[in-house]
């Protein structure tokens, strides 16, 4: 329902802006559109987190994150195309109605979160949703997942019914596990903004115009397009490499890109006293070096912060998931506002090299936080990840929990193999056919090497 409400705000905001004939109307439209963006930014990743299978949850959230830079690429391309068209900006904003209306029409076909259904007491539908999320799982595995979710919802419901909203707010900051989890996702959101990436999007036209590009409006396609490509690569790797693994690999690339920008801007701006001058024609080689540094920086950003910050719901307990996601997203937009407002002033006072040096310092602090305080959630269910922060920041506990999860999965698989072998023996006995140890070993090896369900294999064997 919350996503549908966001769609309504998207639609109204886009219509108001596209039909604006006064600045106040445009401002009102932007505010309404911003409310829709803020709501969707919180709810969409949370919904995906609760309805996606554990094995591909990262990729599912990544798809959502991918469409952010993809939308930016489309918007930049359309903006460049209508730059010289009379009232072309109206068309640009009017097109924003299309995805919101489309989602309004199609959202009816999506399932509700099973945890929300359990919360409402609709356990039959919740079990059905779990079966649709895990279509190849056995009944025992579905029962296990349902039982874990049911116990967790019961515990969190008891907490919410016994306390008021403000009592829960106080409890969040007094309870170490809640405080650490919300701090983790909030710091990650802040780091994703304070590295300066979004300044490349907001001021790409201005920046690339200063660098001498003939069509500055197309400049936004360079960072946005690179970001979209590497978000796609990152989301395809996230469930294999892991969230923490991608951060440890991708952020150093981003840091090297910032160093590249510092050096590139230093030599580029030497003839103009270290500052960018709109009236000066810069050396094309140096311009190319700077653009290369920007692209290299965006490669690292696309692999990491661009989509991993939206995995925030994974790290939050159910009872603080909405509140924590709201806090983290608010931190994101506040940091975004601070960087956006100060960027051009920083270029004029600190020089471009100094500005990117400042972003480098903030990014190093963010990376240090990732190294020591950002645990891995790969292979863990949404009901298990919130346990990571019970005693500390969960980096070591994550390793132990994932090891235990693999052992549990192996026990389930061994139980299925044993059941299949028993059924095979019984079927052969009914046919009065003896089974040699060698034949049984061969059958078991076939089960282990086949990814299909044992029940299917038994049918074919008999």
From Swiss-Prot:
GO terms of biological process kind: myo-inositol import across plasma membrane
Compartment(s) of residence: Cell membrane
Gene3D superfamilies: MFS general substrate transporter like domains
Name the UniProt record assigns to this protein: Myo-inositol transporter 3B
NCBIfam families, sorted: SP
Family the UniProt entry places it in: Belongs to the major facilitator superfamily. Sugar transporter (TC 2.A.1.1) family.
Catalytic activity: myo-inositol(out) + H(+)(out) = myo-inositol(in) + H(+)(in)
InterPro entries cross-referenced by the UniProt entry: MFS_dom (IPR020846), MFS_sugar_transport-like (IPR005828), MFS_trans_sf (IPR036259), Myo-inositol_Transporter (IPR050814), Sugar/inositol_transpt (IPR003663), Sugar_transporter_CS (IPR005829)
Keywords: Cell membrane, Membrane, Transmembrane, Transmembrane helix, Transport
Signals that turn on the gene: Induced during sexual reproduction. Expressed during infection.
TM spans (from-to): 1-21, 31-51, 61-81, 91-111, 194-214, 218-238, 245-265, 289-309, 324-344, 354-374
Secretion signal span: none
